[in-house]
Amino acid sequence: MKIPRENLYLRNSSLEQNPGKQKQGNLYKKVLNSLKKIGQVNPLICVKDGDKYKVCVGNNRFLAGCELGFKEFDIVIVPDESIDRFREIMNSYKLVNL
């Protein structure tokens, strides 16, 4: 499902307001370069919050996509109570594949 950028926000609001430290990391740079070359492949994992969607997995993809001017993002909506398990899976995937 594609959602306009303005309907998305990061679960960590301070990261969205001041992403400088996040953008200095190697992972962020890899994600930025990947999005430049091939676009968004993996969806953001989100929880519905009223008429908005909270990005719970995919901070780097979201920030890099915003930096590149993406107007919308592919997302998957999960129940709020499932988000911790999704984050565990995605973090273990990153350790193996990056």
Which stretches of residues belong to each language-model region?
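Positively charged, aromatic-enriched nucleic acid-contacting surfaces
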Residues: 82
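Alpha-helical interaction elements
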Residues: 94-98
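Short, charged/polar connector segments at secondary-structure boundaries
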Residues: 1-78, 86-90
